[in-house]
Amino acid sequence: LMQNIQKNAGKLSCSFHKIIKMKKKYTDSCRLFVLKSNRKENQEKMFEVGEYIVYGCKGVCQVEEITHIDIPGSNKDRLYYVLAPLEDRNGKIYAPTDNAKVAMRKVITRQEAEQLIEEMPQIEELWVANEKQRELQYKEALKTCDFRAWISIIKTLYFRKKERIAQGKKITSLDERYLKAAENELYGELSLILGLPKSQMEDFICRKLEA
């Protein structure tokens, strides 16, 4: 997304630039990253086999099984979700069903996705007061599994990239890494919900904002 914006600097071909024109700032607290819908309930209720969920920074996963696992030193009575990441179907994640350390939620609905796309211009930047804490705040924002957090990171890093280019500098490797991570999370979930290839998500968002 940001690469496309940079290529078209000065003559953006789609209205997605409205998202990044509004240079606002969040406070340092990641507590502000909360979906309007009641996502807190997701970790209070069991997910079901076959459901798609977002698990931490691992992106969208499908619940393949809910079972006990026999691992030395573990509580054999503890239940685990066996998760299959969409981007790595051969991979497996064993997540305790009562795990409060890693954010888990159901994927958003199509209606919620369309609403969030419409709200993108109003989503604020991530305000980083202490440069030494920048990477930590990026990590914490990504780990919230919050759609708005991903968009906030993208907007923040776009402006940083723009400022560095104006100074004759390149984007830092740290910023580049988290920009790609946020875009991957954003497009990955939208792709599943809207039934479109990830590569088409940017154009889809543009069309929605132009409508």
Give the predicted meaning of each segment:
Residues 69-80:
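Short, solvent-exposed secondary-structure boundary/capping segments
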Residues 50-51:
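Loop/turn positions that initiate beta-strands
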Residues 82, 88-97:
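A short macromolecule-binding patch
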Residues 59-69:
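Short beta-strand-centered aromatic/proline hotspots
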Residues 97-211:
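Charge/polar-rich, low-complexity and marginally structured segments
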